[in-house]
């Protein structure tokens, strides 16, 4: 991507301000609204927060890793920064759309790039029913919770919960239980990205749950519907020798 219209986003309280100042000297950056590329400096958390904030602009994001986690980021190389951006490859992500209803009947909608999760709010395990495309597939799951992950998010919370890593182009979603108690040996399911997943919370008074879409959390939820969005696209830029697809493969071999 050959462009001189580059915006720069970073945490003003970052402990890496000296490095950031060096990066700022490499080019004349512009306003975010005028940019053709947005560089986000930090870690995966900083990237996700700013993607949520600016995804409506349909501008590609280039993450530059100065954080502790950087799976969706590019390594810092100030000498080749502009060259890496110009020669970068594009990964297109479709976020998940979560619709959740709480005990007061309030409806919440939120997008998730990595995963939507539901989790017990107290020491009591959660109980819920799972429907896929309008068909009941599990009458009762007893667990700490469950999550639905995108391919890009499958190597994050989903992997820690015992779910599989998905290739980026798989057009699949992971449905993964979190510390499942009943059925004890159920490890989840792989679903087409066109699937609609619905969780109906059981015994909500005694066993309340929260729902999250990435970092957005909603309390005392009675039902959650999750599906992949087709009208919302996020473009992430990666160095040509450090693509997201390659990282997903490496993660499966513990590299």
Curated annotation (Swiss-Prot):
Residue stretches in coiled coil: none
Cofactor: a divalent metal cation
Any one cellular-component term (Gene Ontology): cytoplasm
UniProt keyword terms in alphabetical order: ATP-binding, Cytoplasm, Kinase, NAD, NADP, Nucleotide-binding, Transferase
Record keyword Kinase present: yes
Reaction(s) catalysed by this chain's protein: NAD(+) + ATP = ADP + NADP(+) + H(+)
EC number: 2.7.1.23
Biological process, per Gene Ontology: NAD metabolic process; NADP biosynthetic process
Pfam families attached to this UniProt entry: NAD_kinase, NAD_kinase_C
Active-site residues, record numbering mapped to chain: 44
Domain of life: Bacteria
GO molecular function ontology, one term from the record: metal ion binding
NAD recorded as keyword: yes
InterPro entries on file: ATP-NAD_kinase_N, ATP-NAD_kinase_PpnK-typ_C, NAD/diacylglycerol_kinase_sf, NADK
Main location: cytoplasm
Annotated localization: Cytoplasm
Positions bound to NAD(+): 44-45, 49, 114-115, 144, 152, 155-160, 216
Its biological purpose: Involved in the regulation of the intracellular balance of NAD and NADP, and is a key enzyme in the biosynthesis of NADP. Catalyzes specifically the phosphorylation on 2'-hydroxyl of the adenosine moiety of NAD to yield NADP.
UniProt protein name: NAD kinase
